[in-house]
Amino acid sequence: MEKNLPDIFFFPNCVNVFSYKYSQDEFSNMSNMERDSFSLAVFPVIKHRWHNAHVVKHKGIYKVSTEAHGKKVSPPSLGKPSHINLTAKQYIYSEHTISFECYSFLKCITNAEINSFDEYILRGLLEAGNSLQIFSNSVGKRTDTIGVLGNKYPFSKIPLASLTPKAQREIFSAWISHRPVVLTGGTGVGKTSQVPKLLLWFNYLFGGFSTLDKITDFHERPVILSLPRIALVRLHSNTILKSLGFKVLDGSPISLRYGSIPEELINKQPKKYGIVFSTHKLSLTKLFSYGTLIIDEVHEHDQIGDIIIAVARKHHTKIDSMFLMTATLEDDRERLKVFLPNPAFIHIPGDTLFKISEVFIHNKINPSSRMAYIEEEKRNLVTAIQMYTPPDGSSGIVFVASVAQCHEYKSYLEKRLPYDMYIIHGKVLEIDKILEKVYSSPNVSIIISAPYLESSVTIHNVTHIYDMGRVFVPAPFGGSQQFISKSMRDQRKGRVGRVNPGTYVYFYDLSYMKSIQRINSEFLHNYILYANKFNLTLPEDLFIIPTNLDILWRTKEYIDSFDISTETWNKLLSNYYMKMIEYAKLYVLSPILAEELDNFERTGELTSIVQEAILSLNLRIKILNFKHKDNDTYIHFCKILFGVYNGTNATIYYHRPLTGYMNMISDTIFVPVDNN
């Protein structure tokens, strides 16, 4: 199979690659190797121009129905032409005349090997390819890209490293090899914003064919970019939509998939070769309907993302190509080498467009003295913002560990600094309106954020990062703050240096950084359920294997005790969030209850019917003792009395002191048990 991407098929980055139409005179002056490059045009031409086409006779000349209107006729017999008319682009025989393209149309039959194509066929493929606008050259202008993919506006000018000819060749060779690909690159080289667009281009040209050595039938499937959060789906799809010269989704090659998607974000005329931006959960529901699978933010180890990797690896023959993208492989390289079958590793060298300066602010308190450490950290933060201040009209991002700390640090900073203060995290509504204020303000803006801003939203005027170096890692019925990993540091640092030079101020000792094994602090039921659905062998088929396998097996026993069939579980997985696995017992009771419970999981609207149903599950928690936290909050120290984690201690906040027991409705809603 052809492994190298000829120059004429580069994606137009509008910097040193442009859309281009080649003339027959240019073809005549090419070397044999250059001419042979046009043989690969047969694949996109068959898919997008000759599919369902036929021969017509137009003004006495045989042509393809895509060239001219006319009555369908039987094709003429073809030998070697007696004359070539380069100006009219026609082959002339004693009895008839045929267009270059029609000649190629008749010669390019199933099982024809492309290395057998002669000059006569190649000239016709050149004409057909010109009509499709699939060729490129190092000369041209942006406006030449209008119409390449049906776009009304030109492609964006992209100087990033991932769209250089060298990177395009390397990525194409990996894509066409059908090996799993692990792609890394510094923040700012265009991994997420450009590589999916490049794979869309390759899929448009060559996707669906089992080989590029000869003509075969094709089975066209879209590309999917699977992402951990809805915010990322919306952000990256919009970026690529605009960069491909579209202003609306309908009729474009871009589609979105996530739960409760609004009508206006549904592409009602999607392209078979297009790219779907999807949340991980919805990616899993139709995983094998896609030809190329791209999984982004691999370093985050989102639970469903890791499951997709495991499923794709187990069933790799059902997917043409898999790309795993991450900023760094610091934590996962060795595991990926062992886990994936013959993986290809690609690194796109490069850095952010602008220089990033680093500043270390030492905290003299040991982190083991948690409260004292945080108080010193807050004092250091005020000093750092005073010393390293964003310019007027710009912003800085303060990374803290949790949503609660966002409010704590904002309150602290507001009392000591004269700048505009904002909070952005995953639970904040109308983030766009907050950003409008940030962008329109002539003042300095300071944005306090949980790790959400590592990747979910790009702040265009940010010049400074103030990184506390911690993250809250949830665990069943609790969680803990931990210092970040190297990959998380790279993500946070990379928020600056994209538009202007930036400054990264960090408040933690680098020796504190460590890899975070999220699977060791997660509910494991999804691993069990998806393993059943996709015939995974546990634990060896998991990308990341839990340290404590006892919990995995206890989870399996707990799920088996529900007495729900695998078929029903699969339907539940496809249709509902099931943030608590116990909800499955209710989803199977009645369609009406299932609809109300689903609405509760999506919107938080708790009806009396749903509350009573959940209370019937008896998800009981024993209150051991409590203490007063502030005016309207009491901390309750409790013990879980149900499920896999029966006996686990938990800390629950409530607006008044409680004794005895409470029932769990969700991870944030608890109902005291009446002691009477």
From Swiss-Prot:
Q: Which GO terms describe its cellular component?
A: virion component
**Induction of synthesis:** Expressed both early and late in the viral replicative cycle.
Binding sites annotated in the UniProt record for ATP:
185-192
Matching PROSITE patterns: DEAH_ATP_HELICASE (PS00690), HELICASE_ATP_BIND_1 (PS51192), HELICASE_CTER (PS51194)
Q: Which stretch carries the motif DEXH box?
A: 296-299
Protein keywords? ATP-binding, Early protein, Helicase, Hydrolase, Late protein, Nucleotide-binding, Transcription, Virion
Spell out the molecular function terms from Gene Ontology: ATP binding; ATP hydrolysis activity; RNA binding; RNA helicase activity
Query: Which Pfam families does the protein's record reference?
Result: DEAD, Helicase_C, NPH-II
Family membership, please give it: Belongs to the DEAD box helicase family. DEAH subfamily.
Q: What is this protein called?
A: RNA helicase NPH-II
Species of origin: Variola virus (isolate Human/India/Ind3/1967)
What's the source species' lineage? Viruses, Varidnaviria, Bamfordvirae, Nucleocytoviricota, Pokkesviricetes
Protein encoded by which gene:
OPG084
